[in-house]
Amino acid sequence: MENPHEKDQSDALARIISGVSKLNSSIARVNEIQEEVYSRNLNLSVVSEIMQNYQASVDYYLRESGAMKEPFKNDD
């Protein structure tokens, strides 16, 4: 005897499989974007470190050469 619910179960399973496939696609795209964001953040981190080292070098040079001046104050 044939299962009376087999067609409904088969249709439901097909919809689930289709939904999971779309979900996997979406997650793959999110992962790609996340990798791109991580890469850009890493680049920003490197630039930030370079700028901090440069600032430390400038501060050291100005202190050692006696050329460091007080910051400008605006008395408006």
Swiss-Prot record:
Full protein name: DASH complex subunit DAD4
Function field: Component of the DASH complex that connects microtubules with kinetochores and couples microtubule depolymerisation to chromosome movement; it is involved in retrieving kinetochores to the spindle poles before their re-orientation on the spindle in early mitosis and allows microtubule depolymerization to pull chromosomes apart and resist detachment during anaphase.
Compartments where found: Nucleus; Cytoplasm, Cytoskeleton, Spindle; Chromosome, Centromere, Kinetochore
Name of the coding gene: DAD4
Protein family membership: Belongs to the DASH complex DAD4 family.
Oligomer status and interactors: Component of the DASH complex consisting of ASK1, DAD1, DAD2, DAD3, DAD4, DAM1, DUO1, HSK3, SPC19 and SPC34, with a stoichiometry of one copy of each subunit per complex. Multiple DASH complexes oligomerize to form a ring that encircles spindle microtubules and organizes the rod-like NDC80 complexes of the outer kinetochore. DASH complex oligomerization strengthens microtubule attachments. On cytoplasmic microtubules, DASH complexes appear to form patches instead of rings.
Assigned GO CC terms: cytoplasm; DASH complex; microtubule; mitotic spindle
Keyword Cell cycle attributed: yes
Keywords: Cell cycle, Cell division, Centromere, Chromosome, Chromosome partition, Cytoplasm, Cytoskeleton, Kinetochore, Microtubule, Mitosis, Nucleus
GO BP term, example: mitotic sister chromatid biorientation
Classification via PANTHER family: DASH COMPLEX SUBUNIT DAD4
